[in-house]
């Protein structure tokens, strides 16, 4: 990863200048360590943005293959450019489409949800069928910049209040989903890790 430091710095700089949300450093560290520790070989990412997290996942393990979905054309094209710059086209496949319109036959060790927060339950339900037995679903932004922990009265924007409500609903959905064992981490912007239970665990 050291030889790609300049390219990674450039991607992070672009994200900052163009207000593209990317994972916090400790969130990325958690994700890449998780991939190494759990010997993840295949990842489906919902929400490519400019390709930062997909690139970091690919660089963490030379054997991991990533499929990533992005619906915003500008971000999708920027991600393509970044992936090409790092010669990772053979390991990262991008799909330009709304994730809810994507149907994939493939199975993955990990599904990583980092897209529209209001749709997290839909993403989980749609793509959990693409998960290998004992696979994982990781979701970013569970704290959403600290707003999830605030009293709703403190949040002035109506749209933001609705979004926070959706994230809270998603958390309850994960806690009550008996097919998965979910743990929540106060790392980065809040991360949840849901492990698909073995039939014997249920």
Segments and roles (model prediction):
Residues 1-110, 117-138, 142-202:
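A short alpha-helical cap/connector motif
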């Amino acid at each position: 990863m050291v030889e790609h430091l300049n390219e990674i710095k450039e991607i992070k700089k672009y994200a900052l200048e163009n207000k593209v949300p990317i994972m916090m450093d400790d969130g990325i560290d958690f994700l890449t360590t998780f991939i190494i520790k759990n010997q993840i070989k295949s990842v489906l990412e919902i929400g490519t943005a400019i390709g930062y997290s997909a690139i970091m996942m690919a660089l963490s393990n030379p054997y991991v293959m990533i499929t990533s979905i992005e619906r915003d054309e500008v971000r999708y094209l920027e991600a393509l450019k970044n992936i090409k710059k790092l010669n990772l086209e053979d390991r990262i496949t991008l799909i330009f489409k709304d994730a809810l319109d994507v149907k994939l036959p493939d199975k993955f060790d990990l599904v990583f949800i980092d897209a529209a927060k209001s749709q997290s339950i839909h993403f989980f339900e749609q793509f959990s069928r693409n998960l290998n037995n004992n696979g994982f679903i990781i979701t970013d932004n569970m704290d959403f910049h600290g707003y999830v922990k605030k009293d709703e009265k403190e949040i002035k924007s109506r749209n933001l209040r609705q979004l926070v409500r959706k994230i809270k609903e998603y958390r309850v959905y994960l806690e009550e989903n008996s097919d998965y064992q979910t743990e929540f981490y106060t790392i980065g912007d809040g991360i949840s890790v849901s492990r698909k239970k073995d039939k014997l665990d249920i």
